[in-house]
């Protein structure tokens, strides 16, 4: 029994088991299918209505999968792994329609642009940009260290992080549009929907963020651990952060968050491992190393209350909202995929 208790707005729907620790998941745009990849290199496609496994490829990436990105416009998705390959999949076929050979080295980050025209990836100290058909468009010079995260500010600008630096590239040319320096190791990245705020969790147990419109930067310190989980809501008003047992929520309303007190959501018994806002509104899902999942209703000042909860057997690897916000998927360390309806 992997699901011990469900309360509030969460209603049990279905669950399934994959062969190894889950790496990432994603819903198709219409919510009709859920795709999951695992650390053994497996790819699984589930019919989301009932949890039926439509198809799987257990050894898609030799050595294991490391990243996955759903196409934002079409029904396909892309995976990458330790084998130095990027695979572009069509949902209707249990085989990739395109294989990009990076060569030696792990492909650790992967993300489609918002318009689906370009694919960004990173391996080691370099990032590469590909067209939708897999043709390489450009690659960066080596970063100062291994690229830790990628993000798209919009369809024209892509962001990378590494030790000591955030770099904004022109997606068409690879030219540097802007750089932000910080003496520390940046371990996570979240971008506000309007592209103005770049937030990073740091190895020194702080959250650092920059505003492009003003050039100002700020640091929020005092976390008991590394803030590896960050998430903005769809309006850019709230930034939810991990870094301990509590979810710390900073409000960018008015002149915040500088000089304000954050909201603190305190129900988890162990460190936060994953955070995700619903597509619309101020509803947040949190998962922790305690196997607990909570759904929170937040206010614009960052304060909130729990609306639903579920207990699983193992650490939460990821929580992922269906595009309509009416279902939530969770992946736990035992390889269990759990889906709840959200009322």
Regions found by a protein language model. Name each.
Residues 1-343:
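WD40-repeat beta-propeller superdomains and closely related acidic/aromatic-rich repeat-like regions
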């Amino acid at each position: 029994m992997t699901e011990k208790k469900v309360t509030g707005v969460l209603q049990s729907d279905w669950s399934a088991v994959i062969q190894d620790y889950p790496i990432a998941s994603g819903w198709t745009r219409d919510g009709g299918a859920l795709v999951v990849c695992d650390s053994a290199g497996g790819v699984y496609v589930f019919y989301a209505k009932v949890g039926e496994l439509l198809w799987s490829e257990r050894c898609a990436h030799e050595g294991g999968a490391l990243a996955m990105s759903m196409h934002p416009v079409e029904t396909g998705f892309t995976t990458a792994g330790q084998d130095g390959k990027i695979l572009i999949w069509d949902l209707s076929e249990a085989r990739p329609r395109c294989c990009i050979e990076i060569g030696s080295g792990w492909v650790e980050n992967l993300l489609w642009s918002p318009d689906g025209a370009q694919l960004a990836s990173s391996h080691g100290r370099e990032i590469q940009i590909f067209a939708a058909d897999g043709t390489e468009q450009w690659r960066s010079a080596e970063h100062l260290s291994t690229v830790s995260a990628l993000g798209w500010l919009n369809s024209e600008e892509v962001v990378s992080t590494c030790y000591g630096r955030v770099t904004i590239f022109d997606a068409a040319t690879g030219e540097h549009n802007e750089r932000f320096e910080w003496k520390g190791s940046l371990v996570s990245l979240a971008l506000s929907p309007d592209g103005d705020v770049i937030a990073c969790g740091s190895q020194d147990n702080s959250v650092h963020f920059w505003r492009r419109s003003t050039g100002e930067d700020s640091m929020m310190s005092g976390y008991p651990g590394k803030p590896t989980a960050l998430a903005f809501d769809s309006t850019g008003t709230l930034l939810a952060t991990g870094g301990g047992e509590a979810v710390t929520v900073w409000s960018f309303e008015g002149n915040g968050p500088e000089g304000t007190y954050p909201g603190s959501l305190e129900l988890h018994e162990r460190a936060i491992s994953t955070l995700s806002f619903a597509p619309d509104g101020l509803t947040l899902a949190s998962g922790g190393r305690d196997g607990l999942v909570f759904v929170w209703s937040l206010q614009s000042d960052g304060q909130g209350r729990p609306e639903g909860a579920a207990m699983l057997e193992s650490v939460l690897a990821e929580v992922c909202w269906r595009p309509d916000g009416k279902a939530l998927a969770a992946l736990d360390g035992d390889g269990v995929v759990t889906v709840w309806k959200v009322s």
